[in-house]
């Protein structure tokens, strides 16, 4: 376990860049003083932010580059233009070279995934990485993946997601056999596309020792905590994520309006202020910011591009905790024990079922 957690930040990533990244890192540093930062980006912009935060400046090293990946760049464009020179690439490369323990970026998701996959490579048996997040539910927390790394996927890919997600749940939640559900438009076995129905059939047939497959889960089942792990291909998973975050913000706005509408409601708010604060904190989507790229030989955390400093701080916290508690090593050990053999035999089972 490292004495200091070394975090490489893509300081130019996101909708705003350094003016969110640096203040966000400062908030995280206040929570985790045993952190050091490598900051990649425009030195002038970064140092202007650091000037207001001497404690952050004291534990940071700035590496200048004026090449930044735009939010609208296609992954192929980002690789051509920004490979080995962009702030995003350099942050990931620091992890590969052992100069940093984790890279955090709020930049272009497709470009970040392409660069991370190209530079860090995937683990044996994993064809495509996934973005996994931890969501608050009525029953506690659930691991949800894929949140947008890969659009679409066959039954074998969905099974790989189930195995990676269950490995993460075993480590994070201390579960021997996490429950796993496939996100679908209904719970009946006939519902959904061919790929998801094949994945369900495959998971039932294999009856894996490291996870308990419970079948299909509808969208409202995520918030209910219907399973410890919710699996979806990246398109649907990202829509579910954005819908949940939007609903949380909408609810908070409605609540603020209701509590300030009349004198009586304002008085009532004063008496229930503690309860409302707890509810607001629980539903704050910024606290769930920070998706972990699973399936790579290194830790990369993706923050929302449009988040504020507080939200980015939570993404940095995720990276810190992945390193401090050695979660990636533990997840990979679980995959090594169970995942690779399972995925290798899944194709044979799938062929037999067809």
Curated annotation (Swiss-Prot):
Keyword Flavoprotein among record annotations: no
One GO biological process term: phospholipid biosynthetic process
Main location: cytoplasm
Cell membrane keyword on record: no
Pathway membership: Lipid metabolism; phospholipid metabolism
This protein's UniProt keywords: Cytoplasm, Lipid biosynthesis, Lipid metabolism, Phospholipid biosynthesis, Phospholipid metabolism, Transferase
Organism domain of life: Bacteria
Protein EC: 2.3.1.274
Chain's role: Catalyzes the reversible formation of acyl-phosphate (acyl-PO(4)) from acyl-[acyl-carrier-protein] (acyl-ACP). This enzyme utilizes acyl-ACP as fatty acyl donor, but not acyl-CoA.
Assembly and binders: Homodimer. Probably interacts with PlsY.
HAMAP family attached to this UniProt entry: PlsX
Family to which this protein belongs: Belongs to the PlsX family.
NCBIfam families in the cross-refs: plsX (TIGR00182)
Protein name: Phosphate acyltransferase
Species whose genome carries this gene: Nitrobacter hamburgensis (strain DSM 10229 / NCIMB 13809 / X14)
Lineage: Bacteria, Pseudomonadati, Pseudomonadota, Alphaproteobacteria, Hyphomicrobiales
